[in-house]
Design a protein with these regions (language model features):
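Sequence/structural signature of beta-propeller domains
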Residues: 1-165
Length: 165
């Protein structure tokens, strides 16, 4: 899940079909998600604690053919320190960097992808260090050794002038 400005949130629907769904307050409009457009670190999400809130689906993005082939399911979402949206697929054992999502829904497209290789568990959670290294949480039989810190960084912070090849 990714928090968006205005009390909106973006969730990944894992399968049948895999999709991204934006939820927000009733009568609000869908927002586009561009690089740097998620709720900033430390910024308050404008939803008050202790109150019941109603959210409605505002937009749906389905994967294009390349993204669907690269990521067989959508396990987790995260915003990298570069401001881009990233997706983790457990079935494909892949991290994908996604293109901007247009307002109102439509198609989600792949910008880049990284295969995770053999891991000692099922990749279910995604986070990033401030340097852009991916941390993958594994669903394992035992509750230890279930985090993997990947090298090299896949999401270098903005302003560093680095590019991925």
């Amino acid at each position: 899940m990714v928090l968006l400005p205005g009390g909106h949130l973006l969730v990944a629907k894992e399968k049948k079909p895999a999709a991204f769904i934006e939820f927000g307050p009733p009568h609000s409009r869908s927002r586009r998600l561009v690089r740097g457009g998620a709720l900033a670190d430390g910024e308050r999400w404008p939803i008050k604690k202790g109150h019941h809130h109603r959210f409605v689906a505002l937009a749906i993005w389905l994967p294009d053919k390349i993204l669907a082939k690269t990521c067989a399911d959508f396990s987790d979402l995260e915003i990298g320190p570069d401001g881009c949206l990233y997706l983790l697929s457990d079935k494909s054992s892949t991290i994908a960097r996604l293109d901007d999502l247009p307002a109102g829904g439509g198609t989600a497209a792949l910008l880049d992808a990284w295969r995770l290789g053999d891991l000692d568990g099922k990749p279910e959670g995604l986070a990033f260090t401030v340097q852009g290294r991916a941390i993958v949480g594994l669903d394992t039989r035992k509750p230890r050794r279930n985090l993997v810190l990947l090298e090299p960084p896949v999401a270098p912070p903005r302003g560093r002038g680095q590019s991925l090849s």
